[in-house]
């Protein structure tokens, strides 16, 4: 994948999704990934922000982009059930202050196929507009 991106005639981002530990994210950056997701969404917000700050310090050395997550996106990447948590605007602001490029927000969305019609909290995205610099990201949009 990295070799194909280097040969491309257009700009290509190579992104690691849902990296949960500093060693994992560091390895991806050392390999040449141009973007990583620091997924500390299962941590208390203080620990999530602290981990993201460490990843930001590392990513700057590689001129790489960082995506973080606040709230919880229902269903894990492996299909396991995850307790849904809607992102708070306060947590969005705290994470945005780390300097991340993009912010995945839990608004009632889930990975995989939805068992029932989801209730998405669009008001979170509306509240972010104009007050959060990072680009909003929605995971689980294809379910």
Predicted regions and their residues:
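Histidine-centered catalytic micro-motifs
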Residues: 14-19, 135-143
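Alpha/beta enzyme core
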Residues: 1-9, 18-135
